[in-house]
Each structure stands twice: as structure tokens, then as C-alpha cells.
Amino acid sequence: MVDFYYLPGSSPCRSVIMTAKAVGVELNKKLLNLQAGEHLKPEFLKINPQHTIPTLVDNGFALWESRAIQVYLVEKYGKTDSLYPKCPKKRAVINQRLYFDMGTLYQSFANYYYPQVFAKAPADPEAFKKIEAAFEFLNTFLEGQDYAAGDSLTVADIALVATVSTFEVAKFEISKYANVNRWYENAKKVTPGWEENWAGCLEFKKYFE
């Protein structure tokens, strides 16, 4: 039994859901109400002392950080290694894209939008410039490429599509970046679990209305 503690609106949680779908793992989903402090209860702290989501528990083995969970699911349950190839160079590029998503692209979203959504802070133009810079980088990575890392779908695409779709519901103009826009339209068609990802995006969209 693979237990999955999550929120549907969370981009990192959605990347795990899509990865699980891609490798055929059924998740026993457990909604965690952060506003009610469920992540701070002793029983959850025992599982994840960092009290973050997503958190996966696979037959007693607990893991958090979405990109680590993605890789674990592919390595343990993938019927092939196509989503995370064993070739060191291919894997290195995928890792770079995952770290880019975590430290640059998704981080730029969090830095700009979260203060507005959760603290009612005014928009910070400097933080918005970081978003634009992140999209310029991604646009460059995708020049002449259908996928984010290599010539087929990988966990890098899945992580990035979870993030980029969240930018879409925040009304960021993805279409200004031609390569990103082309990649994104293709990713919607080829990423397993896209429909559930989009449903989660629409949950998150309520914060912007």
C-alpha cells in the first residue's frame, strides 16, 4: 500500500500524482488540511519531521520532497527506465532540469505569488522579473526540443508541467515564450494524469479569484 499525503492544489503534489500514473502505481490519497494544522499532529511529524507535503509512505518507507518521490517511484515501479534513464549523461540533464524547477522556476512562483495570495501583500515587480528570467531560461532549454531533457517524456517534463500549469491559472502569459508554449501544449497531450493535474490547478485557481 502506497499512502500519499497531499493537497490537490499543490504543484509538487500533482507532479507525484502524474508520475505515479505514468508508472502504474495506485496511490492511497490522504488529504492533509494544512490550515487546520493536520501536518503538525504528532502522528504526521513521526512520518515526516519536516511536516511538508507531498509525503509518500510505501510499506513503512517514508519519503518527502516531490522530485525525490518522482525518482523513487520510477526506479522502484517503472517497467522501463524511460522516465529516468540509467545513462549518466541523460540522467544528469534530467537532474539539472529538476533542480531548475525546484530552485528557479517553482521558487519564482512561490516568491511572487504566495505573499499576494496568503499574506495579501502587494505585487513585487522585482520578484516578477525573476519569473520572466526563469521562463527565458526554460525557453532556451526547449529550443528545438519537444521535451525538457532528451527526446522523450521524463520526470523533468512532469515536474515542469505541474509548475507551468500553475502559472497558467495564475494568469501568467506563457504564450510570450514560444518554445515553452509549444512544449506545454504537447505536454498536456502526452503526460499521464494531465486531467487530474488540471483539476488540481483549478482548485488552486480559486486563490486568484
Curated annotation (Swiss-Prot):
Keyword field: Detoxification, Lyase, Transferase
GST N-terminal domain residues: 1-81
Binding, glutathione: S10, H51, T52, I53, E65, S66, R67
Transferase in keyword set: yes
Pfam families the record matches: GST_C, GST_N
Domain of life the protein comes from: Eukaryota
InterPro entries reported for this sequence: Glutathione-S-Trfase_C-like, Glutathione-S-Trfase_C_sf, Glutathione_S-Trfase, Glutathione_S-Trfase_N, GST_C, Thioredoxin-like_sf
Annotated protein name in UniProt: Glutathione S-transferase D1
UniProt organism field: Drosophila melanogaster
Gene behind this protein: GstD1
